């Protein structure tokens, strides 16, 4: 029963029987000209299969022709121009090529192993075993202690050391001198250093300079010469006063003797600060009233006449004057403001 079912299945399955072969024992002949059967067995589309197979055939044919020509030339060279035998097979050429290239290839073990540089062996190198055995075979010799030979030089050096070590009178003097020198050095070291100069000096603008002193001296000379020339101070002469009145008013000024020890420059000397920062000009804030009051205060010493600055007439003052004139009854032909 099972045999019948297997036969029926084999008859229905047309794809499994190709050229009378069953699938488990299927063999494909790629060198046959019938390429359609190969494509059907593989299961690739005919268009793709034909293009791939044609490309492979063209490459194989070109490679085969190139290798065939090369093999014929090598065979002719090996035989030394002997007649070509028909028994020569191209497979031998491929095998020889393969063997030569395969022999030149590097093995995997040697390719992937780490490179170790071998140590250089010295020419006089002795094996470790031999060196140990030689050391053991040698008898151990004890090195005897040898005292140094005493010469005349060593004796003289010892004598000099003994002489220096002995305390004599000369040594005491030398030690005293050295101690004194050391004490002098220590005293020099212990002396305090001189005070450093101050970093910031005192300002010089408060001290009198040579130019200021010269100016003061010249001013003092001028004042002394003027006092000797005219002892009587000149007073302002008014036109109304007569010469007799002037003689009656002026009195002789008594001269006060100046002490010789006192210096007149100290009285007239002015500090640089006062000369630099003293205000000698009028400020802009001063008004005409202040000036008039200042001048009147000065003039009071001589005369009792009050000086007054007349203000300019304005339209308001003119109109008030007109009203007053009309009130009193005085008539004017022309107005004052004209």
Swiss-Prot record:
Residues 216-234 have a biased composition (Low complexity). InterPro entries: She1 (IPR031401). Residues 72-88, 284-297, 312-330 have a biased composition (Polar residues). The modification Phosphoserine is found at residue 165. GO terms for biological process: cell division; chromosome segregation. GO terms for cellular component: cellular bud neck; cytoplasm; spindle. GO terms for molecular function: microtubule binding. Residues 1-29, 67-88, 116-146, 210-263, 284-338 are annotated as: Disordered. Keywords: Cell cycle, Cell division, Chromosome partition, Cytoplasm, Cytoskeleton, Mitosis, Phosphoprotein. It is found in: Cytoplasm, Cytoskeleton; Cytoplasm, Cytoskeleton, Spindle; Bud neck. It comes from the Eukaryota. It holds the Pfam family Msap1. Belongs to the SHE1 family. This is Mitotic spindle-associated protein SHE1. It comes from Saccharomyces cerevisiae (strain YJM789). The gene is SHE1.
